[in-house]
Each structure stands twice: as structure tokens, then as C-alpha cells.
């Protein structure tokens, strides 16, 4: 009898979860404040990582930027400093206009910290994380964004590039989380954001290593979320970001069927980041952009494999990566010819 009562209770909780989800969809929750919080972003030197840094800077977060390219990372940091200066000027103007203390949020003591780190190397992650703890303090929000793509068919891809893709795109999430999660758990306070991809939910031909790495991120993130729930660490939030193809140049040349592309074009980076920020700041567990990706993922789970293949071929998604791979191969050959290899 006890298990029967528990079954009805669980059923009620499941239905209530649907009600809450619908309510959040109809009435967007208020964004939480990250002002003064230490937010660490990997792969901050370019692309989505840079845009995430600028968005968090506008919200007065204290930023720690990691990238393997120190020059591009410093360029991002300078953009962040420019935003901080604008916020300081706005605060000064408000004070001059006799604004109340609540209306003026301090920003003048904020700094942005840059670290050159190869997240694909465990030792580099752990040593850099130790420097961050010593020089900056405890990290509140960890945004795992760094990623690479090899751009080769499986049988043509050097083993070293496959390993590199897995290390940077997937294994790095393990190292950074192990470095900063203990303090979050001690305080029951923090937020871990995993930037994966729609190719971590469904796959296509020609990017086996990339898909495997992103599927790994999705599995890692979901298991971590369950582990935090099992440990009753409700103060630590997690957000999984799964965007469709983003127009950052990472997959330049990738094309679906030309008749379909106007209805499903590559995402603008700014739009992708703004949607992700909405999810992060409202503690949303997962965000797929565009929303159509939710439907595609569901259909892939319930349809027969041959039906999925038919859909891929209709959309031109079965070989959408082939032009991208051809461009990468041509660029590699041109570089080798230029260098006399």
C-alpha cells in the first residue's frame, strides 16, 4: 500500500512539474543578479565565448577569461574593460543626479582577469584553476565553452586530431568542474554552464569526433545535474546549452538543402548568446536554439532509423558537412603548398 501511495504522489509531482514549466513559459521568471559574482569563461578569446564575456560584463559580473590564445583573450578583456568604464560613467551620472544608493550599482572595483590555458591538458587546467583561486577567489559561475572541430572524414582524420577534439570539447568539462565544484558544494552555491551543440543530441555524417565529444558533454552534464540533486545541493544550478549551427566561421561552408535553408538559417552569434543568457539567468536547466531542435530530438528518439535517414536526405542534412570538410581540406592543402611541405 505504501508504494501505491508513493506512486500517486510521484504522479502528482510530475504533473505539477508540467504546470510549473508551462507557467515559466507563459510568464518569464525574473533574471537573477550576477553583479559582483566571479564568472569564469573558457574559450573567451573569440566567438561565443567573447560574446558571453561581454554579456556578463554588462551585468556587472567579475570576469575570469581563459583561452589558449593570449592575444585574442586580452582583446576580449579590453572590450570588457570598456564596458566597465561605461558603467562607471553611468553610475557617476546617477550619483550626480541625486539617485538613491539602490539605483546606483558599484562597478569601479571590478577587474577582468585573463589566463592563458589549454583546457585540453589536465595539468594546465588544474594549475590555472589554482592560480584563479589564489589571485581572484571562489568561482560562482563556470561556463565551459571552449571547443574545436577537426573537419575531416573519419578515415582521413589523424588520430591526434580526434584525441584533441575529445580532450578540448569533452574532457575539459571534467577537469574544470573537478577544479571548481568542491567549493560550490561546500557553500551550496554556484552555477555550471555546459555549451554543447545540437550535434550532441543528434548527429550527421562526417563529424564523428565532434558529435562524440558533444554527446559526451550532454551525458556528462545530465549525470552531473542528477548527482547534485541526489546530494541535495539545490543551490548549485546547471544549464545545458545546445544551439543549432552558429554563424561563427567554425563550420563555414556547412549547408543544408537550399530550399530549406531560408527557414533554418545558421544562427546569428548575438542571438544565440542572448537566448543562452536568458536561460542561465533564470536557472533554466536546458536551452535548445531554435526551439525546433526540441522537436527534432524527440522525433529522432521515437522514429525508426530509416525514417530519420529519409528526413535527413529531404532536408539535405545527411551531407551538410561535406562542403565544410572540402573547404577545410583545401585550406590545409594550400597551407602545405605555401610552406613547401
UniProtKB/Swiss-Prot annotation:
Recorded topology in the membrane: Single-pass membrane protein
Compartments reported by the entry: Microsome membrane; Endoplasmic reticulum membrane
Catalysed reaction equations from the record: all-trans-retinol + NADP(+) = all-trans-retinal + NADPH + H(+)
Active site: 210 (proton acceptor)
Chain positions recorded as substrate binding sites: 197
Binding site for NADP(+): 40-64
Segments passing through the bilayer: 3-23
Cellular component terms (Gene Ontology): endoplasmic reticulum membrane
GO molecular function ontology, one term from the record: all-trans-retinol dehydrogenase (NADP+) activity
Stored InterPro entries: NAD(P)-bd_dom_sf, Sc_DH/Rdtase_CS, SDR_fam
Pathway it works in: Cofactor metabolism; retinol metabolism
Any Pfam family hit: adh_short
Keyword entries, A-Z: Endoplasmic reticulum, Lipid metabolism, Membrane, Microsome, NADP, Oxidoreductase, Signal-anchor, Transmembrane, Transmembrane helix
PROSITE patterns attached to this UniProt entry: ADH_SHORT
Organism superkingdom: Eukaryota
Entry EC number(s): 1.1.1.300
Role this protein plays: Retinol dehydrogenase with a clear preference for NADP. Converts all-trans-retinol to all-trans-retinal. Has no detectable activity towards 11-cis-retinol, 9-cis-retinol and 13-cis-retinol.
Family: Belongs to the short-chain dehydrogenases/reductases (SDR) family.
This protein's name: Retinol dehydrogenase 10
Amino acid at each position: 500500500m505504501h508504494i501505491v501511495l508513493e506512486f500517486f504522489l510521484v504522479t502528482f509531482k510530475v504533473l505539477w512539474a508540467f504546470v510549473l514549466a508551462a507557467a515559466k513559459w507563459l510568464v518569464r521568471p525574473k533574471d537573477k543578479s550576477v553583479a559582483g559574482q566571479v564568472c569564469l569563461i573558457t574559450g573567451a578569446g573569440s566567438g561565443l565565448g567573447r560574446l558571453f564575456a561581454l554579456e556578463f560584463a554588462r551585468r556587472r559580473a567579475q570576469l575570469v577569461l581563459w583561452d589558449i590564445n593570449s592575444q585574442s583573450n586580452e582583446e576580449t578583456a579590453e572590450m570588457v574593460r570598456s564596458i566597465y568604464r561605461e558603467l562607471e560613467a553611468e553610475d557617476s551620472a546617477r550619483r550626480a543626479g541625486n539617485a538613491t544608493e539602490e539605483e546606483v550599482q558599484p562597478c569601479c572595483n571590478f577587474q577582468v582577469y585573463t589566463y592563458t590555458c589549454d583546457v585540453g591538458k589536465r595539468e594546465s587546467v588544474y594549475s590555472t584553476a589554482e592560480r584563479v583561486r589564489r589571485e581572484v577567489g571562489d568561482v560562482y559561475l563556470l561556463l565551459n565553452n571552449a571547443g574545436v572541430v577537426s573537419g575531416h572524414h573519419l578515415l582521413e582524420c589523424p588520430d591526434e586530431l580526434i584525441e584533441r577534439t575529445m580532450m578540448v570539447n569533452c574532457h575539459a568539462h571534467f577537469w574544470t568542474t573537478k577544479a571548481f565544484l568542491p567549493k560550490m558544494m561546500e557553500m551550496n552555491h554556484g552555477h555550471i554552464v555546459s555549451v554543447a551543440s545540437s550535434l550532441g543530441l543528434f548527429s550527421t555524417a562526417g563529424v564523428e569526433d565532434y558529435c562524440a565529444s558533444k554527446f559526451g558533454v550532454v551525458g556528462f552534464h545530465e549525470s552531473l545535474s542528477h548527482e547534485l540533486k541526489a546530494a541535495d545541493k539545490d543551490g548549485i544550478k546547471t544549464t545545458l546549452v545546445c544551439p543549432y549551427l552558429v554563424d561563427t566561421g567554425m563550420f563555414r561552408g556547412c549547408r543544408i538543402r537550399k530550399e530549406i535553408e531560408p527557414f533554418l538559417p545558421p544562427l546569428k552569434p548575438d542571438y544565440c548568446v542572448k537566448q543562452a543568457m536568458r536561460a542561465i539567468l533564470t536557472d533554466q536547466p536546458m536551452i535548445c536554439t531554435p526551439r525546433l531542435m526540441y522537436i527534432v530530438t524527440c522525433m529522432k528518439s521515437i522514429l525508426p532509423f530509416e525514417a530519420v535517414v529519409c528526413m535527413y536526405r529531404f532536408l539535405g542534412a545527411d551531407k551538410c558537412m561535406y562542403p565544410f570538410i572540402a573547404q577545410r581540406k583545401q585550406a590545409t592543402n594550400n597551407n602545405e603548398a605555401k610552406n613547401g611541405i
